[in-house]
């Protein structure tokens, strides 16, 4: 039954599921960044929106989340320097991503085979407005190529590299025997994002 859920949602994901999962990703990623800022005695004043001004559509929610990410990462970089912000931000967001991956592995019934990982990634990237494909090199290596990212227009390169650690953590959470690391990102001027994937067995 769980494997069937994974297959169905990878083919078609209802809007309400995308909206719910997007809200959750928004919550946990911004909470991690705010916690980092608080640890460095920084308090960021965020705008409190009333019900009328809250983002309602999927596109609005993605844009709002990305703008919040950018503001928080830039504030951290201004305070402690971009290199330290990158290091600490990636560590924190990798942990968040791994937890998200583990939770979705259970909910979706993700097995150990590569196809299950690709199906789960399809669902999660659909939530974020990211279009991608996978190119296999051999049994142990593959490349993830992102053609479109709804978040990239709101991100600086530093923000993008911090938040990409979430994706890397998600993959590790979905399958503990798989590692992913981004080598190219759209925000650095590349035409596509690329991440190297390695299968341990």
Enumerate the predicted regions with their spans.
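N-terminal accessory segment detector
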Residues: 1-140, 150-162, 166, 177-192, ...
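Mixed-charge, glycine-accented linear interaction segment located at domain edges/termini
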Residues: 168-170
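Surface-exposed, gly/pro-biased binding rims or lids
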Residues: 174
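An acidic-aromatic pocket/loop used at catalytic or ligand-binding sites
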Residues: 195
